[in-house]
Amino acid sequence: MEGGAAGGQRDRETLDAVRSVVFKPSVSLEEKRFPRVQGYDFNRGCDLIGLLDSISSTGFQASNLGDAIDVINQMIDWRLSHDAPTEDCSEEERNLAYRQSVTCKIFLGFTSNLVSSGIREIIRFLVQHRMVEVLVTTAGGIEEDLIKCLAPTYKGDFSLPGSYLRSKGLNRIGNLLVPNDNYCKFEDWIMPILDQMLLEQTTENVVWTPSKVIARLGKEINDESSYLYWAYKNNVSVYCPALTDGSLGDMLYCHSVRNPGLLIDIVQDIRAMNGEAVHVGLRKTGVIILGGGLPKHHICNANMFRNGADYAVYVNTAQEFDGSDSGAEPDEAISWGKIKGSAKTIKVHCDATIAFPLLVAATFARKFQERNNKLA
């Protein structure tokens, strides 16, 4: 009995020791800093805005998406009047009406595949209503917008065999299909424009830059489904330092063989692009970047010249471990001075075709609808 009692005592002591290790006392969490995890209750009905309002408390990348919604809304809502006047500011800068008129300048960057997808229409909405001021994309982000005005892109499948598609004159972008005929139509449309641009260069001393070429193409397409048309009409800057890397480059190559002489000056554009950030004055800057690569770096690098952006939202699936710029987190850009150390930043690890429509629905489009409802 004594041995059994002693063994029982040892077991209890062991259990107490185990419990002290396993059940460490918890610190209390402040719900303001650590909100409770809770998902949307569909008993409330299928309410998109209600769902998006609740998404930040869902967890994982849904919470990152919710944080991105918050950061973009801060970009949109910011006014100079939110900050106290500095001691050395002018009388005009102290004027409340003036301070309420000074807004955040929003840069939007996106890769070409997003224009191939239905994200093109969302970009068009933002540009049509002057919700963003500076766009940066790749050559495909220019040509795909124009080509879609001439012929459609189709939804296919990721698994369609390349050799089969090649034999049928079909090009695959993920699960999207672009017929070769689309590029033939693009060539027929753009060659006379390039001829005219060369003539203006020769007879009027016009100095073409990538952004001037893009604006001209937006003017010539004259199609309200095109975001480039609206960028031209609303004087929204569109930059593409890699203008030759795509079908547009193929057209420039062919044109240079048939009718040589057209020159495009990239130096003027880098000065203009950096100036978009340098000359913002008292404004803040916000960056929204879909995907990575050139558009991401070009926007962040321009903001380095003003000691960094004030807000940054990244949406991409790239990872940081390989040292790529595409996968770099906002904190890496802070080390370069491309984003301010005090900036509001978030990266959403998600396909932008999923995340961006939801982001726009909960921010730009929601505010647009609310304004229209007030005017009705």
UniProtKB/Swiss-Prot annotation:
Q: Which InterPro entries match?
A: Deoxyhypusine_synthase (IPR002773), Deoxyhypusine_synthase_sf (IPR036982), DHS-like_NAD/FAD-binding_dom (IPR029035)
Q: EC annotation? A: 2.5.1.46
Domain of life per record? Eukaryota
Q: Which organism is it from?
A: Musa acuminata (Banana)
Query: Which residues hold spermidine?
Result: E143, E144, D250, H297, G323, S324, D325, E332, A333, I334, S335, W336, G337, K338
Q: Where does NAD(+) bind?
A: 112-116, 138-140, 144, 245, 292, 317-318, 351-352
Q: Which family does it belong to?
A: Belongs to the deoxyhypusine synthase family.
The name on file for this protein is Deoxyhypusine synthase
Q: Which PANTHER family match?
A: DEOXYHYPUSINE SYNTHASE
Task: Name the catalytic site residues.
Answer: K338
Catalysed reaction(s)? Answer: [eIF5A protein]-L-lysine + spermidine = [eIF5A protein]-deoxyhypusine + propane-1,3-diamine
| Enzyme category, top tier | transferase
Cofactor(s), names only, from the UniProt record: NAD(+)
